[in-house]
Curated annotation (Swiss-Prot):
SET domain location: 965-1056
Name this polypeptide is given: Histone-lysine N-methyltransferase set-9
PANTHER family per UniProt: HISTONE-LYSINE N-METHYLTRANSFERASE SET-26-RELATED (PTHR14571:SF9)
Catalytic activities: L-lysyl-[histone] + S-adenosyl-L-methionine = N(6)-methyl-L-lysyl-[histone] + S-adenosyl-L-homocysteine + H(+)
EC class name: transferase
Bias (Polar residues): 206-227, 645-669, 873-882, 1242-1252, 1533-1544
Chain intervals with Low complexity compositional bias: 77-100, 1282-1293
Tissues in which the protein is found: Predominantly expressed in the germline (at protein level).
Main location: nucleus
Region of interest (Disordered), residue spans: 1-102, 112-131, 198-227, 448-600, 645-781, 857-895, 1089-1318, 1356-1623
Keyword Methyltransferase set for record: yes
Gene name, Swiss-Prot/TrEMBL: set-9
């Protein structure tokens, strides 16, 4: 053991502290020892011999043969000591146990009781052992063999597991020398019997010398007294006990008492006259006594039959000093029997210092009952003095090398593969022990100290020998310096094997490694010396047997030679001595018995059969020679397989199979029993072996060769050929063929029941089929099954399913199940009462249909097979593939049993892979030699347990079930639920493409499995899953052992590769009760915690995102609701505004209607009318004038668009906003600012002339004469222009635009006006667009651009804007003009009054009637009548044709200005009285003009000459206008010579019309400029109506001359010469 360890065994015995007593005088005085306790045995051989020749060493075989031992009793009262040596037991007193004290190191420093250090001579004497003393420790817990087993195999135990836990408790059986023999130990570890051998008692024996000394009566020498003493702790307080290294000693390890001893003190140890016990080592050498106790703690003892003076001291005193002789020659102490020592401290004289180990201590037996098992004793460990020591086995193995095979073969890098191949060529084959009882030995090799002068030569460890002393008599011994070490070969072999399992249960190394030839076991050299031993002698290379080259690494020649040697290799005897070196066996030891070898299964054959799937290549023959060679090898392999299969009862006749019961045709095949695996059937090769194991209850079946042949089946169908046996239909005698169903669902295969022997109808003999499929069916038929179905039939054809509760079978169709149904936990209707979807009658009819189909298929198969049988002639099997018939090369049915079901994806994957060489043979062997079966390992816990010894790399069982891909099955990660995941089919190596996991294969053993479904997982597995690919894409997944597995051992597999992803606890077979101790479970829990934390983090992030999304949606919903509420509010406001507008409009229409009715009633009806011809002529003239005006407008628009810049337009728009009237719309409704601004004249409505007195005056200079106060009367012409008002509806069509007569051109005054800003049509377009948006949208939000609003403008636009000082000056001028206009209005009223009086005069018949009045004119006339001027004026004289009425200067000036301003005025809307006038077309206008109208009397005052006017189409109000409000194209001027005649109403007759030449519009337009300026004398035509003017101009005919112009007066000429602000 290592330094510092103080282990106490479970059965340690402590002694209570005895009461302080006075030392008895009978005790001999102790001998003072001058050395520290336990310093080793003297090296001098004479001391050892002197010990053996001492007279006190009398053999104790006669005394101890029939002696019993008892516990020490409680100290009674003093008794009389008898005079004869009689052993008397005392009453048992149980001791008081106290806690042991940590013992100090018993080397390097003296004990606390030793005050004097040892001298140099004493130290040398203490370190003087005998040369031939070698102590072997074969049962130490720290031996290297156990470490190797743990490192290579990861075994939780070693072969020393059943020994006592402490080395002191182990008994070494004597094999040579005069040892005291023992008969054994009882159940309480007590020595049953002990004696000395007969040859040990002789003339020169220690016993003889003892008798001689006893007869002489001489006392014992001081040196021999110490050899008799045994180191024995007294009964005292352990806390005060001295630090000793010796173990308590008593005879046989029992506490004894002797007669005559003091009753107050128990006798401990050995006295001179008592029964002596010879202390010697394994080789018969005596050992000196060491480590005596101080006297103050030593017990007292009475010598028997001896005087006090003859007693010798047993223990030395701490303070006293002995004699020089005692100090110079200390007495060696003999160890107890069975003790062992280390070889320590190599000294110059050769040999070593043996350090005494603790002896075994047996428990004493009681007379009255069993021994007390609670008694314990302290165990003290003896430490060597030299710490520089190295322990290793005699045949040590090297340290566990770098295990390349820990990596799975398909995950190895190319460098690892190369290193593994190199290791496979260099290492030796494993060596197995010859006998289980032989164990490895351990020696201590000590480094030589620097001060040592020489060293004993160490034998070479390669020879695997031990330094041992021969068996000799004591008298024949020679001095040590003359002795020569004898080399004897060892008697044992060190078992060094390897495994494929992971040495340390790390999570990263427990993936299922693949068993291929790329990862063979590593063998360590059995005779290799430890590398850490300095000055090691060169060793001979060990004799090893290299492992044969794997098949996938063989060349073609090596393969041929290997298969050829298979037969001869099997005939050789296989024993452990054949593989061991010949020089390792000792000559005098008989050879050990050979180990148990499974004869049908050979290790070399396994190596030949198992081939790596990853390295295998197709063996396609290229030449006829290759084909012949391959055929021979195949035949040789088949015969070799038949050799050992024939031992089980096969014969040559059994290798012929008959097709359909006929012997005419035979086929050569391999005799391998293919049986149907089922989880209910028993193993086939059950053999009864004498054993008392717990799993041997079911091993009573007969061997295979002794079993009678089972009765053959009465019929055979395709399912039985395909290894899917079915039952026999009820009531049928003909062969039935069942259609093979798809096994993709939950249906299970129902094994056939044992049936009676049926006679064949063809030959009258027993129907026998010798092929492998039928044999497998017959073997499976041994099991009986029960069919209890809903339909009432008991046949087993079709898809059936087994109830998990009562283990009965039902038809799936009768239970309402399909192949796709989930039947993992199916129970019948009896175990789980429920209502079935199929009634009994329907189920019976369905089964009848199934049976009919089976019968029809059987008849069809029979008809197909009969002609083939007649053509067969040969019945002898062919020995060559070339000579075989063609039918054998292309068999109709596969010969390999398909014991598995495959999904579509799995089948596609397997068909694309290459076949493994020898796979069919290996699969047949695994099915034939099953080495495990299901058993109960615990209560209600079944597992797979081995039924035979399984060697490493042997196949135990084949896993059968439903093979599918991992993506097709729902499984539990890590393994479980009878589903095994296999990753051996994955492609690629480490560092390459490992695939996407689609090649992970899962085998579901619940559907079609065998006993492998009960295999459990473990963190220290002893098996793995491997695979081979046979013919017809048959995947064989097998359980292969990774170490030697003994019988009755549970088979465990590693966890699946995805065990970390499991959410439930792993079911570890090693830690079922303490799962937290499993490293895999701990790792899985850590991964699960990390995975849960990641999932919680993701959930938290998702929750935060969800909350943020909900908050965003909530805010959007709030904004949406606010917008909807605002929109609704605005819609309601707009609706209210529109309703208010409609109500106001309706009210206005009612008022207008009333006014029109009143005016119509007040106006006199006109009797005069014009003819249709005259009306047509007027219409043609007006049409011509309209066209001319339109052409002029287009030209003017083009000219303005070219000349007007954007800056001017914006300035004009700004000015228009400033000059726009505020009360343009009479309806009181809110409107945006853009609707209140004044824009282009194309869309800007005219302002109403009926403004309230509180309104500010209009800023537009062109409208200041048009907007008079409401209280003042206006003339006819002004009222016509002022009646246009703004309408709420914006007109977008061009036909709704109305222009005045002078809109197409400019007067000279307008042309000369520089301060008038041009019309801004850009603003009109913007307003038009805004109005369109307002009309189409529900929310009226019109926002003008920034450059239109009142924001800051750029410098260019600011420079182009008009000067506000000039605007204010213009406003003042307009106010002055308004005052002047009021005065003129007063004068005009007098003229109108005159005209009214003129209308009242009677008209003549030939005089044309007045022009018709419009409704508006009538209405205004009524107003003028009501409103009389303030100052009455004198009515003017009546105008006549010769004397036209003259106007004053102010009146003419105002009228001229008004005409100038209104020349470019555009009227696009109806009058104010009519909010929405009715629009008419030109056709309606012509139809209205064609109607007869009465000529009305001219009631308008004379006005200035203006251009011609084309009536608008926008209503009746503007059509029937007076002539005075229309500028004419031609008027009398200074260039016209024709006089103008005005027919006054007072003239009695109409004048004769004169011829008037009608000028063209161009001629009239040339003269209008002067006429428009010279308006001093108003012509008479302006006071006429339209008809009067037509008659005056044209007369009754077309040639009517125009009236002459009025004469010019001085006032007129002077007025024209006066400059005005428009000139």
């Amino acid at each position: 053991m290592a330094d510092g360890e103080h282990t106490l065994p479970a059965d340690e015995e402590l002694f209570e502290q005895p009461p302080p007593q006075q030392q008895q005088p009978e005790i001999a005085e102790p001998i003072v020892m001058a050395q520290e306790p336990i310093q080793g045995v003297s090296e001098d051989p004479q001391a050892s011999e002197a010990t053996h020749e001492a007279p006190d060493n009398y053999p104790v075989d006669h005394q101890m043969e029939n002696q019993e031992f008892y516990h020490e009793p409680q100290i009674p009262e003093p008794q009389q000591i008898p005079q004869i040596p009689v052993f008397q037991p005392a009453a048992y007193n149980p001791p008081n146990y106290v806690a042991p004290q940590q013992r100090a190191n018993n080397f390097g420093e003296p004990a606390a009781a030793d005050a004097r250090p040892l001298t140099e001579q004493e130290q040398l004497a203490a370190e003087r052992p005998t040369e031939d003393t070698v102590w072997i420790d074969s049962d130490d817990d720290t031996d290297v063999e156990e470490a190797i087993l743990r490192a290579n195999f990861w075994l939780p135990y070693s072969d020393h597991n059943y020994d006592p836990p402490d080395p002191a408790d182990r008994i070494i059986l004597p094999t040579e020398g005069p040892f005291p023999c023992i008969a054994g130990l009882d159940e309480d570890c007590n020595i049953v019997k002990q004696w000395m051998p007969e040859d040990a008692v002789g003339p020169g024996s220690p016993g003889t010398q003892y008798r001689r000394n006893q007869q002489a009566g001489g006392g014992l020498p001081s040196t021999s007294v110490a050899s008799q003493q045994q180191q024995l702790p007294v009964r005292h307080n352990i806390q005060n006990r001295p630090m000793v290294a010796a173990q308590p000693f008593s005879i046989g390890g029992n506490q004894v008492e002797y007669g005559g001893m003091d009753s107050r003190m128990q006798q401990r140890g050995v006295v001179r006259d008592g029964p002596q016990y010879r202390v010697m080592n394994d080789f018969g050498n005596g050992l000196p006594m060491r480590g005596l106790l101080p006297p103050r703690n030593s017990p007292a003892a009475n010598a028997i039959n001896r005087a006090r003076e003859q007693q010798q001291q047993m223990y030395h005193q701490a303070g006293a000093r002995g004699s020089l002789q005692q100090r110079a020659a200390p007495a060696p102490a003999d160890p107890t029997p069975g003790s062992y020592q280390h070889i320590v401290n190599a000294v110059p004289g050769g040999g070593a210092n043996p350090m005494r180990r603790v002896p075994p201590q047996a428990r004493p037996g009681m007379i009255g009952g069993a021994a007390n098992n609670n008694r314990a004793r302290p165990t003290h460990v003896t430490r060597p003095m030299d710490t520089q020591e190295f322990e290793h086995p005699v045949a040590p193995a090297a340290a566990p090398p770098h295990r390349v095979v820990d990596v799975a073969p398909h995950r190895m890098t190319p460098e690892q593969r190369q290193e593994l191949q190199q290791m496979n060529r260099q290492r030796a084959a494993p060596q197995f022990p010859a006998a289980a009882a032989q164990r490895s030995a351990e020696v201590i090799v000590i480094q030589q100290r620097p001060g040592a002068s020489s060293r004993a030569p160490r034998p070479s460890m390669a020879q695997e020998d031990l330094l041992r002393s021969p068996t000799r008599r004591l008298s024949e011994r020679v001095p040590q310096e003359h002795q020569t070490p004898v080399l004897e070969p060892r008697r044992f072999q060190v078992k060094v094997t390897d495994t494929y399992s992971t040495p340390i249960p790390k999570a990263s190394d427990q993936l299922p490694a693949q068993l291929t030839e790329e990862d063979p076991p590593e063998e360590s050299a059995a005779a290799a010396a430890p590398e850490d031993v300095p000055d090691a002698a060169p060793e001979d290379p060990p004799k090893v047997i290299l492992k044969p080259t794997p098949p996938h690494r063989m060349t073609q020649e090596e393969k041929n030679a290997h298969f050829a040697r298979l037969t001869t290799d099997k005939e050789k005897p296989t024993s452990s001595t054949s593989i061991l070196p010949q020089d390792a066996a000792p000559p005098h030891v008989p050879p050990p018995p050979p180990p148990l070898v499974l004869r049908p299964h050979h290790q070399d054959e396994t190596l030949a059969m198992v081939q790596s799937v990853f390295e295998s290549k197709p063996r396609q023959p290229d030449t006829p020679k290759d084909k012949e060679t391959i055929s021979k090898i195949a035949d040789l392999l088949r015969f070799s397989a038949d050799e050992f299969t024939g031992q089980s009862g096969s014969s040559a006749a059994a290798r012929q199979r008959t097709v359909s019961g006929s012997a005419a045709r035979a086929q050569t095949y391999q005799m391998h029993h293919q049986q149907q695996q089922h989880h209910h059937q028993m193993p086939m090769d059950q053999r009864k072996r004498p054993s008392s194991g717990r799993y041997d209850a079911l091993m009573g079946a007969m061997p295979l060769q002794q079993q009678p042949p089972p009765p053959p089946s009465q019929f055979q169908h395709t399912d039985s050929i395909a290894h899917r046996p079915r039952g026999r239909p009820k009531g049928t005698r003909h062969p039935s063929v069942a259609v093979q169903p798809q096994r993709s669902g939950g249906a299970r295969t129902l094994p056939p029941r044992a049936q009676t022997v049926a006679m064949s109808a063809r030959n009258g003999a027993n129907a026998k089929n010798s092929d492998s499929e039928s044999e497998g069916i017959d073997e499976a038929a041994e099991e009986s099954w029960t069919m209890r179905c809903h339909c009432g039939m008991d046949h087993g054809d079709g898809d059936t399913i087994e109830c998990e509760g009562c283990k009965t079978w039902q038809h799936m169709a009768c239970m309402g199940l399909t192949l796709k149904s989930n039947t993992s936990k199916y129970k019948c209707e009896m175990c789980l009462p429920r209502r079935l979807p199929v009634s009994k009658a329907e189920a019976a009819r369905e089964q009848e249909r199934i049976l009919n189909r089976l019968r029809a298929a059987a008849r069809k198969q029979k008809r197909k097979s009969e002609p083939v049988e007649q053509k067969q002639k040969s019945s002898q099997p062919s020995t060559s593939r070339k000579s075989a018939p063609m039918a054998l090369q292309q068999p109709a049915e596969p010969r390999v049993a398909q014991l598995n079901d495959y999904s579509k994806q799995a089948s596609a994957l397997l068909f694309g892979m290459e076949q493994t060489a020898g796979a069919d043979t290996l699969l047949a062997e695994s099915r034939l030699h099953k080495k495990a079966r299901r058993m109960f390992v615990e209560e209600a816990v079944e597992a797979l347990v081995t039924t035979d010894l399984v060697q490493i790399r042997q196949v135990i069982l084949e896993v059968n079930g439903h093979v599918s891909m991992s993506s097709e099955v729902k499984r539990q990660p890590g393994g479980g639920n009878c589903i095994f995941m296999y990753d051996g089919l994955m492609k690629g190596t480490a560092g390459e493409d490992m695939g996407d996991g689609q090649e992970l294969v899962c085998i579901d053993t619940k559907r079609k499995g065998n006993d492998t479904k009960f295999t459990r997982r473990s963190c220290v597995p002893n098996c793995v899953l491997k695979h081979v690919l046979g013919s017809n894409a048959t995947l064989g997944i097998m359980i292969v052992a990774t170490k030697d597995i003994t019988r009755n051992t549970e088979v465990t597999l590693p966890f699946d590769a995805d065990w970390r992803e499991s959410e439930v606890e792993l079911e570890c077979a090693e830690h079922m009760k303490e799962l937290q101790a499993c490293p895999f479970e701990s790792e899985r829990r850590r991964f699960a915690a990390e995975r849960h934390r990641a999932m919680d983090h993701k959930k938290q992030e998702a929750e935060e995102a969800r909350r943020a999304d909900e908050e965003r949606r909530r805010l959007e919903e709030e904004v949406r609701r606010e917008r909807a509420a605002k929109t609704k509010q605005m819609d309601e406001a707009e609706k209210a505004r529109l309703e208010a507008e409609k109500a106001a409009e309706k009210e206005k229409k009612a008022k207008e209607r009333k006014k029109m009715e009143a005016s119509a009633a007040a106006a006199p009806e006109s009797t005069n009318s014009i003819t249709a011809r005259e009306e047509r002529r007027i219409q043609q003239a007006e049409e011509m004038f309209r066209r001319q005006e339109e052409e002029g407008k287009r030209k003017e628009a083009r000219r303005r668009s070219k000349s007007v810049t954007p800056g001017v337009l914006e300035a004009a728009g700004t000015a228009a906003r400033e000059d726009a009237p505020e009360a343009s719309i009479p309806v009181p409704a809110p409107s945006p600012p853009a609707s209140r601004r004044s824009v282009s004249r194309t869309t800007q409505p005219s302002t109403s002339s009926f403004a309230t007195p509180t309104e500010p005056p209009a800023k537009n200079k062109r409208m200041r004469s048009v907007v008079p106060p409401k209280s003042e009367p206006a003339s006819s012409a002004k009222r016509v222009r002022a009646t246009t008002v703004a309408t709420p509806k914006a007109t977008t069509a061009n036909d709704s635009r109305k222009r005045t007569a002078s809109a197409t051109g400019k007067t000279p005054v307008a042309k000369r006006s520089k301060n008038v800003a041009p019309t801004s049509f850009a603003l009109a377009l913007i307003e038009k667009e805004l109005r369109e948006q307002a009309r189409n949208s529900t929310v009226l939000e019109m926002i003008l651009p920034d450059y239109i609003m009142n924001e800051e403008r750029s410098g260019l636009l600011a420079g182009q804007s008009p000067d506000f000082s000039e605007v204010r000056a213009q406003i003042e001028e307009e106010n002055r003009m308004k005052e002047r206009s009021r005065k003129r209005e007063a004068k005009k009223k007098a003229v109108e009054k005159e005209k009214k009086e003129h209308r009242k005069e009677p008209k003549k018949t030939n005089e044309p009637g007045p022009a018709p009045k419009s409704e508006k004119a009538v209405e205004k006339a009524v107003e003028k009548v009501e409103k009389k001027p303030k100052s009455p004026q004198k009515p003017p004289a009546k105008p006549t044709a010769q004397n036209p009425p003259l106007k004053k200067t102010e009146e003419v000036d105002g009228i001229e200005r008004e005409a100038s301003e209104s020349s470019s005025k555009e009227s696009s809307v109806a009058p104010e009285e009519k909010k929405n006038p009715k629009k008419i077309t030109f056709a309606e206008y012509n139809s209205r003009r064609s109607q007869k109208r009465e000529a009305g009397e001219c009631s308008t005052p004379p006005a200035v000459t203006r251009r011609g006017f084309i009536p608008s189409t926008e209503g009746e109000d503007l059509v029937n206008v007076e002539l005075s409000a229309i500028p004419l194209d031609d008027h009398p001027s200074s260039s016209n010579t024709a006089p103008t005649t005005t027919i006054a109403p007072s003239v009695g007759g109409a004048p004769k019309p004169t011829s008037v030449v009608v000028k063209s519009p161009s001629t009239r337009s040339r003269t209008r400029g002067a006429a428009s300026e010279s308006a001093d004398d108003a012509p008479a035509e302006h006071s006429m109506s339209l008809q009067d003017r037509v008659f005056s101009m044209f007369g009754s005919t077309v040639d009517a001359p125009a009236p002459p112009p009025p004469p010019a007066s001085a006032e007129t000429n002077s007025r024209r010469s006066r400059s005005t602000r428009w000139n």
